[in-house]
Amino acid sequence: MAKSFFYDIWERKELNNILKINSGRDYKQLNSGNIPVYGTGGYMLSVNDKLSDTDAVGIGRKGTIDKPLYLKAPFWTVDTLFYCTSKENSDVKFIYLLFQIINWKRYDESTGVPSLSKNTISSIKTYVPKVKEQDHISKLFFSLDNTLQLHERKCEELTL
């Protein structure tokens, strides 16, 4: 019989109960280096200082608001990209998976350039299991993603 990884019921919580939303900052005063800088479109360049030394999930504040990024520490984010760190009761990789299924455009606060605020993100409600189950789920999906990427690279090599 297969071992079940699912233990408890999932609780409905606001995102502010499982994560902390941090603001990006301007990087132009920094020198070139090996720390990646991310904006809403992804990787931009590398600098010599970090904004965070904890893995996080990036979500656009302005512009592209519906393409979450998994940010491996250390990193820097510009001011148009929030970075969300996990609280003690949550797994950052699980938060990334949650962010993939949220309909971010539904929470757009603008009449022009798509925008999100910390308050809006904080108040989004979702269902969350205990951290142990979050860890199992995130490991499963990240393993599947890694396997898919490996096979995609192999297919690309075969077509060359």
Regions found by a protein language model. Name each.
Residues 3-37:
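Non-catalytic DNA-recognition/assembly elements of restriction-modification systems
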Residues 5-9, 83-89, 105, 119-135:
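Proline-centric
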